[in-house]
């Protein structure tokens, strides 16, 4: 599009723009939606089936994504591959040397995603579109139960019991006119969020968390360790003029 190739790092980002869908008679069928926005292709749960089908390499989508996204997704897929290799050592082995340990526990719902789809993997058409927002809405955490006058203090009704908010979390919601808006939680305590005044907030709006500040810090702080096995041999021999020592070392790579 426009002489730019996404495969060469010059994506025009057409999927993030909003469009009207008009028929041949000029009738507007869909107005102001991200019509080209698709959910993210995710076959995390099908890796073993794909490996059995002969796939030997898996591509992680990382174009225009931030570092925490790449770390999170790569770690998630890597653990899945490790589990398959450890369970079926006679069938599979890692293509790279060494072993990775430690680090954070990945959770792909907590970094950028526009929802997930498996597309045609089973030969059936699924739900692909993410037309309401080309951005990452995040995970739904609840709805607005109360607002102060200038809409800078929000009381939430959570959808679950184990939701914990953190100072600095990012939130999104759909405005009354169907647009996606967002804000940062400067102070989050229990079910209360304090933020800069956000006029488009309203009672009953569903609230999504698209930046989990605690998880972002965990990714940044807890790095994984890659270890490569090394074999060392040291020997000593007694000769006429005294002891002679030799040493050699080799790594698995």
Question: What are these language model-derived features?
Answer:
Residues 1-253:
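Surface-exposed amphipathic alpha-helical tracts and adjacent flexible/coil segments at the periphery
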């Amino acid at each position: 599009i426009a002489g730019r190739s996404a495969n060469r790092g010059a994506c025009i980002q057409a999927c993030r723009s909003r469009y009207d869908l008009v028929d041949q008679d000029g009738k507007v069928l869909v107005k102001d939606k991200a019509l080209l926005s698709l959910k993210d292709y995710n076959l995390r749960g099908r890796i073993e089936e794909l490996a059995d089908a002969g796939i030997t390499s898996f591509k992680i989508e990382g174009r225009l994504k931030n570092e925490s996204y790449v770390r999170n997704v790569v770690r998630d897929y890597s653990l899945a591959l490790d589990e398959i290799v450890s369970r079926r050592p006679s069938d599979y082995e890692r293509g790279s040397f060494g072993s990775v340990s430690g680090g954070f526990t990945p959770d792909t719902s907590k970094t950028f995603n526009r929802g997930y789809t498996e597309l045609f993997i089973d030969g059936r058409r699924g739900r692909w579109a993410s037309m309401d927002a080309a951005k990452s809405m995040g995970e739904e955490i609840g709805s607005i139960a109360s607002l102060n006058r200038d809409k800078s203090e929000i009381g939430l009704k959570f959808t679950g019991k184990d939701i914990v908010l953190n100072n600095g979390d990012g939130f999104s919601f759909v405005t009354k006119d169907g647009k996606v808006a967002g804000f940062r939680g400067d102070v989050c305590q229990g079910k209360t969020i304090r933020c800069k005044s956000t006029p488009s907030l309203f009672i009953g709006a569903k609230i999504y968390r698209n930046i989990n500040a605690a998880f972002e810090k965990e990714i940044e702080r807890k790095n994984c360790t890659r270890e490569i096995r090394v074999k060392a041999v040291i020997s000593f021999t007694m000769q006429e003029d005294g002891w002679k020592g030799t040493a050699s070392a080799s790594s698995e790579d």
